[in-house]
């Protein structure tokens, strides 16, 4: 068992040091942090200049931004007209999209509980999606 653990450790050490150096990739590229999309904004429209929605679970769109704050895509909210369980559906969608933080004007208790359980941070902001995301990255 100890021998197997040593082999795993050596392989992980090799992958973490040699491969990035040989390929010119940084550790951030290997981990995927910067390349993974990780910020979503509940929005009224599908553009990055859209107003942030005050209806988190029923927002018409979720705008996805990457780890550097660049706009990636807009996703139509499949739960926009859902009668019940919108917060669960939205949380599942955000997890599928590798979202780490959700921004909206306000969050209801059910949405907060679902996001916490999924490990998704949530921030309350108003304004346009692009302005708010840029302000977060300036901090």
Per-range role (PLM):
Residues 2-82, 125-139:
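Non-catalytic interface/targeting segments
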Residues 47, 109-110:
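Short alpha-helical
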Residues 62-64, 97, 110-132:
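Short acidic, glycine/proline-enriched helix-loop-strand junctions
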Residues 72-101, 120:
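Compact, charge-rich alpha-helical regulatory domains located at protein termini
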């Amino acid at each position: 068992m100890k021998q197997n653990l040593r082999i795993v450790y050596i392989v992980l050490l090799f992958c973490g040091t040699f491969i990035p150096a040989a390929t010119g990739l940084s550790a951030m590229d290997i981990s995927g942090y910067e390349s993974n999309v990780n910020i979503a904004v509940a929005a009224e429209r599908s553009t990055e200049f859209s107003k942030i929605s005050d209806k988190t679970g029923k927002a018409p769109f979720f705008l996805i931004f990457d780890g550097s704050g660049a706009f990636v895509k807009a996703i139509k909210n499949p739960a926009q007209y859902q009668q019940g369980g919108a917060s669960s559906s939205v949380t599942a969608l955000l997890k599928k999209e590798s979202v780490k933080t959700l921004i909206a004007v306000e969050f209801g208790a059910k949405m907060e509980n679902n996001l916490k359980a999924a490990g998704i941070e949530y921030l309350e902001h108003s304004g346009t999606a692009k302005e708010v995301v840029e302000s977060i990255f300036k901090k």
